[in-house]
Amino acid sequence: FAIRRQRQMCIRDSYISLPKFYIDFNDRKSRNSANDVKNEIIKLKNNGIVGLILDLRNNGGGALQTVVDMTGLFIEKGPIVQVKSTGNRKQILYDKDPQVVWDGPLVILMNKMSASASEILAGALQDYNRAVIIGNEKSFGKGTVQNVIDLNRFISNSSYDLGALKITTDKFYRINGESVQLEGVKSDIVI
């Protein structure tokens, strides 16, 4: 997580690099990338920034609820992503908070290694016409949701750590209904 402030030709733009959508599973409410980015944006606004660049290049994803919360920093409220599980059971995840932390110009940088949660954020903000996506022709194209199961919670073993199992449980779709699986999020400006 890095922040760089630049001043060019009397225009103030700020840059936030986000390598993944992290969360502390022991303190989900306060220790996550959405809260950290929110706090940084508030500081940057107090310093008079005019534009914001969010760098998601090489961001392979992360916690689903964190990306929903982060998307909510840039829109009033509404659907963020559709999640479909076995049997085509569909759940729509919403931003329910009408507070917008940043409503100014927003650029998202992506590349071929931007995947999963990065594609949820970029796709939703593109669907809301809220951000300009700049990068490779398209992002990675990972339209699936995975869950981590801590095996130590299910099997009693005091001798050693049993580890965890990561399984794919759902597919996700943009709010416009499109899948990013193998297709990715297409950049508005290709560099």
Predicted regions and their residues:
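Short hydrophobic-aromatic micro-motifs
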Residues: 14-16, 167, 180-181
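Beta-strand-rich C-terminal secretin pore/gate domain
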Residues: 148-160, 187-190
